[in-house]
From Swiss-Prot:
Annotated gene: whiA
Biological role stated in the UniProt entry: Involved in cell division and chromosome segregation.
Region feature (Disordered): 306-327
Keyword annotations from UniProtKB, A to Z: Cell cycle, Cell division, DNA-binding
DNA-binding region: 275-308
Residues passing through the membrane, by range: none
Pfam families the record matches: HTH_WhiA, LAGLIDADG_WhiA, WhiA_N
Family annotation (NCBIfam families): DNA_bind_WhiA
MF terms (GO), sorted A to Z: DNA binding
Organism annotation: Rhodococcus opacus (strain B4)
Biological processes annotated in GO: cell division; regulation of sporulation
Name used for this protein in its record: Probable cell division protein WhiA
Coiled-coil blocks: none
């Protein structure tokens, strides 16, 4: 089951006892999943959701809290619909339900944001508002670089109201318009986890956090492996380049090279992958790595100086692109 469906399934089974919270959830769910329609001169309230368990929960709460009966209609998958959709409809008492849930104000005008009783309610009501909004049009992506919890909103006013509800819960959310749709988005992993718990999806949070931790460990391991590989490649290329320059230096100087410099040069050529410290230990008598580096540096400098005086290619000419590609 995808993460979004897991969250919605858990929220649909959540038992809520406080009446104000139950009403806030219903109001939010109807606001974010529904619409008001005029059919035969009467107001009809509709809400379209993607899980049968959500539709059953909404129908039950509408009856328990407001004593109104709701019908549930199933739109089967097919055509552009990848999965079944469920429409909860209240026709006979639609206007009364719309007024009691805050979809209509006292003058009978549609409320664009969240109802005043939800916006000004308790922190628990803010949690319920988020629960209803997520059940209506929420989504949660798998943990990763672009993980996000977001809710599609019916308009900018509803989006801003949801951002305000998140702020009351100590969670930072952002409202933005994406391809003509207003959305509220949370990207921070800690904030996503906190909101899942606040809404009542603690079990799904644990699963999400486990996947998140596993992905972070895997990403860290990959970064370290790539770092080590890059360092090894750089070290190998540097060793090949150094040996090639030393070989060229010995060719340029011939018999003119001092014995102590020649000895250091031959060590470098014969032990291409050895570190300077290891070369020093191989020397007879042993030397420090600084002494080895100094002798090789003087050998190259002497050879480059002679190459310049005689007009022949210097030691750098031995380091070709093909040579480094083969390293």
């Amino acid at each position: 089951m995808a993460m979004t469906a897991e969250v919605k399934d858990e929220l649909s089974r959540l038992v809520v006892t406080h009446v104000s919270c139950r009403k806030a959830e219903v109001s939010s769910l109807l606001r974010f999943a529904g619409g008001l329609h005029i059919v035969g001169g009467r107001v009809v309230v509709e809400a379209e959701v993607d899980l049968g368990s959500t539709a059953r929960r909404l129908r039950r709460e509408i009856f328990d809290l407001f004593t109104y009966s709701a019908d549930v209609h199933v739109l089967s998958a097919g055509g552009l619909r990848k999965s079944s959709r469920y429409i909860v409809r209240v026709a006979k008492e639609g206007e009364a339900l719309a007024r009691q849930t805050g979809l209509l104000d006292l003058r009978g005008r549609p409320v664009r944001g969240l109802p005043a009783q939800v916006v000004g309610g308790s922190v628990a009501d803010a949690e319920a508002a988020w629960r209803g909004a997520f059940l209506a049009h929420g989504s949660l992506t798998e943990p990763g670089r672009s993980s996000a919890l977001e809710v599609s909103c019916p308009g900018p006013e509803a989006a801003l109201a949801l951002v305000g509800a998140a702020r009351r819960l100590g969670i930072s959310a952002k409202a933005r318009e994406v391809r003509g749709t207003d959305r509220v988005v949370i990207r921070d992993g800690e904030a996503i986890g906190a909101l899942l718990t606040r809404m009542g999806a603690q079990d799904t949070r644990l699963v999400w956090e486990e996947r998140r931790m596993r992905r972070e460990v895997r990403a860290t391991a990959n970064r370290l492996a790539n770092f080590d590989d890059a360092n090894l490649r750089r070290s190998a290329r540097a060793a090949v380049a150094a040996a090639a320059r030393v070989e060229r230096a010995l060719d340029i100087l011939g018999d003119e090279v001092p014995d102590h410099l020649a000895a250091a040069g031959h060590l470098r050529v014969e032990h291409r992958q050895a570190s300077l410290e290891e070369l020093g230990q191989l020397a007879d008598p042993p030397m420090t790595k600084d002494a080895v580096a100094g002798r090789i540096r003087r050998l190259l400098s002497m050879a480059d100086r002679k190459a310049k005086e005689t007009g022949i290619p210097d030691t750098e000419s031995a380091v070709t692109a093909d040579l480094l590609d083969d390293a």
